[in-house]
């Protein structure tokens, strides 16, 4: 009798590829690859009113900062322009969610030399993004251990000034 291990291994690997994270369908496609290839730094779009604490999905007015004159004939840009005119935001699908009981500062991480790719994967190579990294307490603590950052509970679970 042949051993079923090679066949089983093939099935497991194939299943892994079929369950690989697909990018969520966004209301307007956005290519990080295309925008970063033009030399635009992440902070051009990913800003926040409170510098650096929580960056997130840029408001449509940020997109329109360029797209009032760039690719205006694109149906996708026209969709963004409609949202801007209506003062509404597209119903973006958030990829990463940080629980409200966790204090997380992009600013602190970037100031210590962390790169966006460390958590978000090779953004510059992606047409669309998907959840590439398990954002969990264990993953954060492991990164803190590797980078000699504090793993004291209050470091992330109490707002710091």
Predicted regions and their residues:
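Positively charged n-region of N-terminal signal peptides that target proteins for export
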Residues: 1-4
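Bacterial N-terminal signal peptides
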Residues: 8-15
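Boundary at the C-terminal end of the N-terminal hydrophobic targeting segment
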Residues: 17-22
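Alpha-helix-centered segments that form part of catalytic cores
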Residues: 85-110
């Amino acid at each position: 009798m042949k051993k079923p291990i090679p066949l089983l291994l093939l099935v497991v690997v194939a299943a892994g590829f079929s369950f690989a994270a697909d990018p969520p369908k966004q209301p307007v496609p956005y290519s990080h690859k295309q925008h970063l290839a033009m030399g635009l730094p992440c902070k051009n779009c990913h800003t926040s009113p409170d510098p650096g604490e929580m960056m997130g999905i840029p408001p449509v007015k940020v997109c329109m900062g360029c797209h009032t004159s760039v690719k205006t004939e694109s149906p996708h840009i026209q969709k963004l322009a409609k949202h801007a005119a209506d003062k509404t935001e597209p119903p973006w699908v958030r990829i990463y969610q940080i629980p409200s009981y966790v204090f997380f500062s992009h600013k602190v991480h970037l100031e210590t030399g962390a790169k966006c790719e460390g958590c978000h994967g090779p953004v510059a190579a992606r047409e669309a993004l998907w959840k590439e990294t398990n954002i969990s307490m264990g993953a954060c603590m492991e990164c803190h251990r590797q980078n000699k950052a504090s793993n004291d509970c209050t470091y992330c679970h109490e707002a710091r000034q």
